[in-house]
Amino acid sequence: MTAACAATIERLAVLGELVPVTTRVNEQYRRVRLPGPAPLYAITTNGAEILVNGKPDRDWSRSVADRLAAGFPLDAVWEQASHVCHPEFTVKLRNADGLFCYAVVRPKHLPMGFAEDVAGWAAERGWRTSLQGRKLYWVPETLTKSAAVREVARRMGADRVLAAGDSLLDVDLLLAADAGIHPRHGELFDQGWSAPTVTCTESSGELAGEQIVGWFEREAGGASA
């Protein structure tokens, strides 16, 4: 993160409620340090957890667990992932708090068509996949970031939601927001994804990060275009 990016993030905390949203589980999220004051709300585990002042909202967690219980079970997905993720290209397979799973892979060693095959298998069972760098995720379609964001926005009485993301697991979030942005790199850019209410940065890498937080600041009314 550049110094300019960090400074803009600190200013954003004055313009509105900055809510981190991540696929990371709580333990992984707590290792992340963002500039500025600690957020009142954070959304982790791809929407399964809403943290309020750093503590999980148990009612929300229970409602998510009840919703997921009606779907195709994680145990069966884990079994399939264990079967198809061969040692030649898989470093390890991980369970994310009993909600979804992911494999740490060597992307350059993945067999031709592997990502498409696992995506097809998952889709037939109400799950979706996302390849983000070295991590290949299997996540239930009913576990979404957008549902958690809508709940947080409702509690806050927010009249406008802005969002940023770079993976297929961010699509529902970007589409649910009033406006969104994604960087000129990552899974969404590589797949040519676009939407009328979502813009793309002009640059990639660290400069994309600066452009994203600058976009947030302008959209929130804190800087001139």
Give the location of each predicted region.
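Mg2+-dependent phosphoryl-transfer enzymes with acidic/Ser/Thr/Gly-rich catalytic loops
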Residues: 138-139, 146-225
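Substrate-recognition "cap/lid" segment bordering the active-site pocket of phosphatases
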Residues: 51-71, 127-159, 220
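Active-site phosphate-binding/coordination module
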Residues: 2-90
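Short secondary-structure junctions
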Residues: 86-94, 124-129, 199-200
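Charged, glycine-interspersed solvent-exposed loop segments at helix/strand-loop junctions
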Residues: 92-108, 132-139
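Substrate-recognition/cap helix-loop segment adjacent to the acidic, metal-dependent catalytic center
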Residues: 24-43, 109-129
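Short, surface-exposed ligand-recognition loops at beta-strand->loop->(often short) alpha-helix junctions
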Residues: 68-72, 105-112
